[in-house]
């Protein structure tokens, strides 16, 4: 009976331990040293804080300031006004230079005035088209892309018309000199010789024309055809008494 009582006592203690363990909760088995889990949790929290700080730093970069459409339109209008003002000043300067040129006939003055007026109208029209966003197809010299001989011939005509409208300006000869020099920089020597020969021939032709005009002016200021007054008097006296004696000789001595 004693043995049975001891076994019963052992069973009783085991049961009591099991009941106490069940009441207090499951037993947690730790695979790591004490404090190791806590350090890992702390490191995880540090990573979370760093990520949060990076996110707060990156957020202001993503925000973009949007410029109001009204402000953009005002800036565009201001640019157009400045461009128009600049073009008007250039036209005014050209008109002043043209007015200072000597020996301009009234017809030439009227033609120059009409030309300046047309340039002003074209400038205003282009500004109005740009302001209202009107897309006009490009024509004329700006639309050309010459590739054949005929294309370059037509291109040259349009370019000549574009340039020669400023030929009355005081700066026109210097402009042409610089232009010809700049556009001929890439040419070969043989091509430059051909261009030089053409300009030399043109120079000789202009000199001949000037000499011819000078001779014509001198002839107009020369002696009147027929001998003038003296010739007419000689003819009259010759008819009256002859040139050898009489009034004819006296007239010669007097003259």
UniProtKB/Swiss-Prot annotation:
Q: What is this protein called?
A: Eukaryotic translation initiation factor 3 subunit J
Source organism: Xenopus laevis
Principal localisation:
cytoplasm
> Keywords, A to Z?
Coiled coil, Cytoplasm, Initiation factor, Protein biosynthesis
For the keyword Transmembrane, the answer is no
Q: Which InterPro entries match?
A: eIF3-like_dom_sf, eIF3j
* Organism classification: Eukaryota, Metazoa, Chordata, Craniata, Vertebrata
Q: Out of the domains of life, which is the source?
A: Eukaryota
Family per record: Belongs to the eIF-3 subunit J family.
Q: Which GO terms describe its cellular component?
A: eukaryotic 43S preinitiation complex; eukaryotic 48S preinitiation complex; eukaryotic translation initiation factor 3 complex
**Which GO molecular-function terms appear in the entry?**
translation initiation factor activity
Assembly and interactions? Component of the eukaryotic translation initiation factor 3 (eIF-3) complex, which is composed of 13 subunits: eif3a, eif3b, eif3c, eif3d, eif3e, eif3f, eif3g, eif3h, eif3i, eif3j, eif3k, eif3l and eif3m.
Function of the molecule: Component of the eukaryotic translation initiation factor 3 (eIF-3) complex, which is involved in protein synthesis of a specialized repertoire of mRNAs and, together with other initiation factors, stimulates binding of mRNA and methionyl-tRNAi to the 40S ribosome. The eIF-3 complex specifically targets and initiates translation of a subset of mRNAs involved in cell proliferation.
Coiled-coil segments: 69-131
């Amino acid at each position: 009976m004693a043995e049975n009582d001891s076994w019963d006592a052992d069973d009783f203690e085991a049961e009591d331990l099991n009941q106490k363990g069940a009441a207090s909760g499951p037993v947690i088995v730790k695979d790591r040293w004490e404090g190791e889990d806590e350090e890992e949790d702390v490191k995880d929290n540090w990573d979370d804080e760093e990520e949060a700080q990076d996110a707060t730093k990156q957020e202001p970069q993503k925000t973009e300031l949007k410029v109001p459409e009204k402000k953009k339109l005002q800036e565009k209008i201001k640019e157009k006004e400045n461009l128009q003002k600049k073009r008007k000043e250039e036209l005014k300067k050209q008109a002043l230079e043209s007015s200072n040129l000597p020996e301009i006939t009234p017809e030439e003055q009227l033609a120059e005035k009409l030309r300046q007026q047309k340039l002003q109208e074209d400038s205003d029209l282009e500004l109005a088209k740009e302001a209202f966003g009107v897309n006009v197809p490009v024509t004329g010299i700006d639309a050309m892309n010459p590739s054949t001989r005929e294309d370059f011939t037509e291109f040259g005509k349009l370019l000549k018309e574009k340039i020669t409208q400023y030929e009355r300006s005081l700066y026109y000869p210097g402009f042409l000199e610089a232009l010809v020099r700049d556009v001929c920089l890439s040419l070969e020597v043989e091509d430059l010789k051909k261009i030089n020969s053409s300009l030399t021939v043109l120079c000789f032709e202009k000199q001949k024309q000037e000499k011819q005009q000078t001779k014509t002016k001198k002839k107009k200021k020369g002696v009147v055809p027929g001998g003038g007054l003296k010739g007419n008097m000689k003819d009259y006296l010759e008819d009256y008494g002859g040139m050898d004696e009489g009034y004819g000789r006296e007239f010669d001595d007097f003259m």
